[in-house]
């Protein structure tokens, strides 16, 4: 019997940036999928704020993911036929909610994409597309943003830009972020780093440096 996660109990603070690291097969991606309601645990419970998401039916879980969890993926997952503005506002449209203009303006100006709103994904660089994806994740004011290798397809310059944006979302907008990454240079942007191995959390680190993180991953 394979246990992807084994007796894991962990909490994530509001307004905090947490990175999850570990070798392939360590359980980090499974943990993220369960935290985001994309997979269900075979036992145990998961809470997003005060909601036990493991007790929700499919329809309620879908609504919770749409309204209270923002997703940022390695592959951007933008709709190619929509411009940046429409991609950012898509979660609001799907929820039947009117977007808050002041919040929209604050996000696109903070992320430096106000001059790209009429551009489709094919007309933007990878870094610009990921900024749009971050803006889309922020638009619904989610309880938490879950980021799965968000810089995996980016060059080093775009990686620094996107990580700066996620850091600012935490510091300036009070956003909570949980990120899975294999990259120590990316993980040091976080307030806290969890290291997984064999389905367990083996280290829970704060104030990390690249050197201390490299040592913890050995």
Residue ranges of model-derived segments:
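ABC family nucleotide-binding domain
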Residues: 1-190, 195-196, 201
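Conserved beta-strand-loop-alpha-helix hinge in the C-terminal portion
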Residues: 200-218
């Amino acid at each position: 019997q394979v246990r992807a996660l084994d007796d894991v109990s962990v909490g994530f603070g509001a307004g905090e940036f947490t990175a999850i690291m570990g070798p392939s097969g360590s359980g980090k991606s499974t943990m993220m999928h369960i935290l985001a309601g994309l997979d269900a645990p075979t036992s145990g419970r998961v809470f997003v704020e005060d909601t036990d998401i493991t007790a929700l039916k499919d329809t309620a879980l879908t609504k919770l993911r749409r309204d209270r969890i923002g997703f940022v993926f390695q592959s951007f997952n933008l709709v190619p036929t929509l411009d940046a503005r429409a991609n950012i506002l898509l979660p609001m449209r799907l929820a039947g909610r009117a977007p808050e203009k002041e919040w929209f303006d604050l996000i696109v100006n903070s992320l430096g994409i106000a001059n790209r709103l009429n551009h489709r994904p094919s007309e933007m660089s990878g870094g610009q597309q990921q900024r749009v994806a971050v803006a889309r994740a922020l638009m619904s004011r989610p309880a938490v943003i879950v980021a799965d290798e968000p810089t995996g397809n980016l060059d080093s310059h775009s990686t620094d830009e996107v990580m700066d944006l996620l850091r600012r979302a935490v510091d300036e907008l009070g956003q909570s972020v949980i990120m899975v990454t294999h990259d120590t240079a990316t993980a040091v942007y976080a307030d806290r780093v969890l290291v997984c191995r064999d389905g367990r959390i083996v280290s829970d680190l704060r104030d990390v440096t690249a050197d201390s993180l490299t040592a913890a991953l050995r």
